[in-house]
Amino acid sequence: MPYEIKKVFASLPQVERGVSKILGGDPKGDHFLYTNGKCVILRNIDNPAIADIYTEHAHQVVVAKYAPSGFYIASGDISGKLRIWDTTQKEHLLKYEYQPFAGKIKDIAWTEDSKRIAVVGEGREKFGAVFLWDTGSSVGEITGHNKVINSVDIKQTRPYRLATGSDDNCAAFFEGPPFKFKFTIGDHSRFVNCVRFSPDGNRFATASADGQIFIYDGKTGEKVCALGESKAHDGGIYAISWSPDSTHLLSASGDKTSKIWDVNVNSVVSTFPMGSNVLDQQLGCLWQKDHLLSISLSGYINYLDKNNPSKPLRVIKGHSKSIQCLTVHRNGGKSYIYSGSHDGHINYWDSETGENDSFSGKGHTNQVSRMTVNESEQLVSCSMDDTVRYTNLTLRDYSGQGVVKLDVQPKCVAVGPGGYTVVVCIGQIVLLKDQKKCFSIDNPGYEPEVVAVHPGGDTVAVGGTDGNVRVYSILASTLKDEGKLLEAKGPVTDVAYSHDGAFLAVCDASKVVTVFSVADGYSENNVFYGHHAKIVCLAWSPDNEHFASGGMDMMVYVWTLSDPETKVKIQDAHRLHHVSSLAWLDEHTLVTTSHDASVKEWTITY
């Protein structure tokens, strides 16, 4: 096998303000799962760096839940499709697919024998359905609500009971199977966001945007108590999760705290303050074995510490929005990956362990378009917020100093020796020296798109939407057009010099990579065909003999310079999402990022 996946650094959950996010637990207690875009992400709870991504939904997935048997997962998307798929094999084969209603699926519940499934959401003609998992035959009706149903749960002991919570401020109670509506519960004054039965089936709890949690008898549906008497939280409550022994309840709220409740004596055991920023609102939670997890509005997953509520044991960071660019850098004997996303967030990853964090301080406020590392160990990034930032990679702290404000929006940045940085903006090429603007070409006569600086530092290649690459010289802090026009096969999407400076690779929107030989006056060396859609990124291997290209066809090719027929093809590198950026950690390790917000490492063998 010429390639194999080495590491997957998964995306964070996709979250929305004021909407609860469901974390699904694995009955064995080893994994947890959540959704982002069209992906379902399964992670090991003890070592979250171990992840698996399921990408077979055609639409955005909202919720995924393990069957109590642990052998299958049911996942539902915004179109109303429910897919039931195998968890035991890497291929995740589809077992059944149903369309219980047309509209967003918001929650899923299984009976303890893994034979029946309840699905709720915002359908057009009904808000819920309950059916047999293998035939799809109905085993009851979910009625009694006149607005979207947000949550459903089924008692895990016989006799079965089913409870729902809705935007009509009510919960509803059902007996079955076949499940029949018994009564509505009108104790809440705002949307009911979450209903959950305790594992032993004796009680169920409802949580609402009014900040209250009510406990009811699991068999009869009679009210037992309100947690915290009048109010459980100062803000809306988005999620609740029972402890495995059914005595305690974990709650997550918009008041930026999570709490553990002792349900038997109706008191708070611990309060976890998560911060003061709006991004610290808590939208989801999960209690699995000894692990207490919560999701913040930032998308971060917090491992809560019962012994020290003020500080989480660990926080899983990463990206929840599409990654636009990446670069790699060795620091203190370790290789780090830096990735920048659509929301301006830059994250750094230890390439071996997957340990990661974001820079401290206030950084870019809009999409990070391109990043590279200069000779003084600074990360140079350009963003749609019209700035170029220089960030010290030892301190990893955004400072107020290293920011250059530009007149127009930058699209690409490249660095060379001597403190030079070349920035391609909309209709402008800017030369910076030592973080100061020293020269610019306004109205170059074409639309520049991408830029690369020769390792020697004296030459700059700029690719344009007109399908040409122009070569400039850096002379005494100015850019001089050498009058050299290199023709690509279509609008240029990326340019890259090999590390020894001998070759320039150019990729274009016409699905072709052209390599020019620098020493022979930029004569055409070879042309590489294979992609089925626009190529968007290029990266040279440190051996200068191979280079990789990634495109909108979800494919990555690793090409051999001397022979275009000898290539490694990584099909579906990021399934259903196009590859956005590439970089090499060493001669045999390639890193790819994509709009699915994940980072992957591949081992390439020739």
Swiss-Prot record:
Residues modified to Phosphotyrosine: Y238
Show me the WD repeat boundaries: 4-45, 48-87, 93-135, 138-176, 180-218, 224-263, 270-306, 311-351, 358-408, 432-474, 480-518, 523-561, 566-604
Sequence positions bearing N6-acetyllysine = K28, K81, K95, K115, K480
> What is seen without this gene?
Embryonic lethal. Partial deficiencies disrupt megakaryocyte maturation, platelet shedding and provoke neutrophilic autoinflammatory disease.
Localization annotation: Cytoplasm, Cytoskeleton; Cell projection, Podosome
Could you tell me the keywords of this UniProt record? Acetylation, Actin-binding, Cell junction, Cell projection, Cytoplasm, Cytoskeleton, Phosphoprotein, Repeat, WD repeat
Q: Which gene encodes it?
A: Wdr1
Q: What does this protein do?
A: Induces disassembly of actin filaments in conjunction with ADF/cofilin family proteins. Enhances cofilin-mediated actin severing. Involved in cytokinesis. Involved in chemotactic cell migration by restricting lamellipodial membrane protrusions. Involved in myocardium sarcomere organization. Required for cardiomyocyte growth at the postnatal and maintenance at the adult stage. Involved in neutrophil actin dynamics and migration. Involved in megakaryocyte maturation and platelet shedding.
SMART domains listed in its UniProt record: WD40
* Coiled coil segments of this chain: none
Give the record's GO biological process terms: actin cytoskeleton organization; actin filament fragmentation; apical junction assembly; cortical cytoskeleton organization; establishment of planar polarity of follicular epithelium; maintenance of epithelial cell apical/basal polarity; neutrophil mediated immunity; neutrophil migration
What family is this?
Belongs to the WD repeat AIP1 family.
Q: Where are its TM segments located?
A: none
Name of this protein: WD repeat-containing protein 1
Keyword RNA-binding included in the entry's annotation = no
Which residues, if any, are the signal sequence?
none
Record flagged with keyword Nucleotidyltransferase: no
